[in-house]
Amino acid sequence: MNAVYSHLAKTYDRELHDMQYTAYLKVPQLVIEELGHRQASILDLGCGTGLSSLLIFEKGYDVTGIDGTSAMIRRARKLPYKKIIQQDLESPWRVRDHSFNAAVMVGVMEYIIYPGVLFRQVRNKLVDGGVFGLTVPYKSKCYEDANLKSYYRKEITPVIRKAGFNIESSEKTLGFEDAGQKVAYLNYLLRKRQTTSSSD
């Protein structure tokens, strides 16, 4: 995946625009509406060139980005991230537990091999009641042909709940068009369930 995105880095934003890709606007907006005007720290997972945090920066939130592709990160560093960390999202993240009010992850789930592990890691980084906005690719032959992950709601819902999240909202929307084929996303807003004194 890193090799693919390193090659795309220079033209990535323009190509998404040409594909009429809007998930990078819709999912962050869900998080912004939930957080309101209070000061907040946000984790941008798979931040890429920073598109998924453009609306978030406008609100003045502190944003930490994580991405595995150096070429993408070089572009993201031009934006007002508080911190950017280069690492694989399926490795333990080098950020403190229970230190973020929200997380966003757009256009990443199709590459994640172990979604349950990733969801639990997100949960550990959020404060109690923290929110997680993300896209989940809706089951499609387009993804299967490319050896990427995609899901029906009934497949991903138990994974989400088992990881310790409640589903606040989910909406099926057009993600993009590929060779004339419409590819859909499920846009989710999740909330971390409250911890108890006996368990994390």
Task: Map each language-model feature to its residues.
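A short glycine-rich, Lys/Arg-flanked "PGG" loop and its adjoining helix->strand segment in the class I
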Residues: 116-128
